[in-house]
Amino acid sequence: MNKKTLLVIFFVTMLIVDEVNSFRFGSFLKKVWKSKLAKKLRSKGKQLLKDYANKVLNGPEEEAAAPAERRR
């Protein structure tokens, strides 16, 4: 399974759990926000945003020279 499929399964599971336990939507958002997956997604998003901001501010970096071919 790819990451998108797992994310959809996670959200559907959280919706079902939240619906069974309570009818308040705020508690569901708290659970999602505090979950490990959400923390990983936020940190990945922050890193991508920082990289993008650095590229915009500093201009595109020159690409490193291609590595020499490996001998077999």
Curated annotation (Swiss-Prot):
Keywords: Antibiotic, Antimicrobial, Cleavage on pair of basic residues, Fungicide, Hypotensive agent, Metalloenzyme inhibitor, Metalloprotease inhibitor, Protease inhibitor, Secreted, Signal, Toxin
One term of GO molecular function: toxin activity
CC annotations in GO: extracellular region
Record carries keyword Signal: yes
Propeptide feature: residues: 70-72
Signal peptide: 1-22
Tissues where this protein is expressed: Expressed by the venom gland.
Biological process annotations from GO: defense response to bacterium; defense response to fungus; killing of cells of another organism; regulation of blood pressure
Subcellular location: Secreted
Domain of life: Eukaryota
Additional observations: Shows a very weak hemolytic activity (6 uM causes only 3.5 % of hemolysis). Shows a alpha-helical structure.
Function: Amphipathic peptide that shows bradykinin potentiating activity and antimicrobial activities against bacteria and fungi. Has higher antibacterial activities against Gram-negative than against Gram-positive bacteria. Also inhibits NADPH oxidase-dependent superoxide production (IC(50) is 0.4 uM on granulocytes stimulated with PMA, IC(50) is 0.51 uM on HL-60 cells undifferentiated and IC(50) is 0.53 uM on HL-60 cells treated with DMSO). The C-terminal peptide shows a higher bradykinin potentiating activity than the complete peptide.
Family: Belongs to the non-disulfide-bridged peptide (NDBP) superfamily. Long chain multifunctional peptide (group 2) family.
Name recorded for this polypeptide: Bradykinin-potentiating peptide BmKbpp
Lineage, opening ranks: Eukaryota, Metazoa, Ecdysozoa, Arthropoda, Chelicerata
